């Protein structure tokens, strides 16, 4: 039975013939392939110092808790004072409205900033907006504890904080909101933060120290001396009088 099946299969295979209708199809396919142009692969430029993958986890902090070593002691420091006439951080950049501190520079803790942010989100719940933070906590505060004698080191880590200069923007907001609603949200947030704050809009004049650059006032005008100088005639007469005076005997 097996021999008969193999012989029948062999005879069927030998009876196969190539059809003549395949010749024009093959010619047409060859002509089409000759017309088509091969698509060259697009070269991908990869920098030599960039890894295509990473086996390490991403270590990134937030605006309230940075990815810094807590065991490394930090100096207390002082907030930035723009003595050279800088207006950096005093105007609204990304949003339409902002919250600006106007009384005195100070250090604000991360807990206070988080409370102010939660207050704004609670007031604007259900609205379409975007909140921008213009400050970030990057200063570690170390406390040695109550009733501790002087010395024995700086102390252990307590919390994160940020140094805020006078007239610096802390929060900005942009969205489909009424101005009065945003004013109310910033008013509630200002009550949660230390100091006095004001509501500013995009396009308001910048501030140098505690002086607003408005009504044609410029930084060059602030650099001029406030004390009025003596007239040239008065200075020349004073010099001539001192030169002609007789020396004391």
Curated annotation (Swiss-Prot):
Keywords of the record: Mitochondrion, Ribonucleoprotein, Ribosomal protein
SUPFAM superfamilies: Ribosomal protein L16p/L10e (SSF54686)
Top-level taxon of origin: Eukaryota
InterPro entries: Ribosomal_uL16, Ribosomal_uL16_bact-type, Ribosomal_uL16_CS, Ribosomal_uL16_dom, Ribosomal_uL16_sf
Subcellular location: Mitochondrion
Any one GO CC term of the record: mitochondrial large ribosomal subunit
PROSITE patterns for this protein: RIBOSOMAL_L16_2
One GO molecular-function entry: structural constituent of ribosome
Gene3D superfamilies: Ribosomal protein L10e/L16
Self-association and partners: Component of the mitochondrial large ribosomal subunit (mt-LSU). Mature N.crassa 74S mitochondrial ribosomes consist of a small (37S) and a large (54S) subunit. The 37S small subunit contains a 16S ribosomal RNA (16S mt-rRNA) and 32 different proteins. The 54S large subunit contains a 23S rRNA (23S mt-rRNA) and 42 different proteins.
PANTHER family in the record: 50S/60S RIBOSOMAL PROTEIN L16, LARGE RIBOSOMAL SUBUNIT PROTEIN UL16M
Function of the protein: Component of the mitochondrial ribosome (mitoribosome), a dedicated translation machinery responsible for the synthesis of mitochondrial genome-encoded proteins, including at least some of the essential transmembrane subunits of the mitochondrial respiratory chain. The mitoribosomes are attached to the mitochondrial inner membrane and translation products are cotranslationally integrated into the membrane.
Protein name: Large ribosomal subunit protein uL16m
Gene name per UniProt: mrpl16
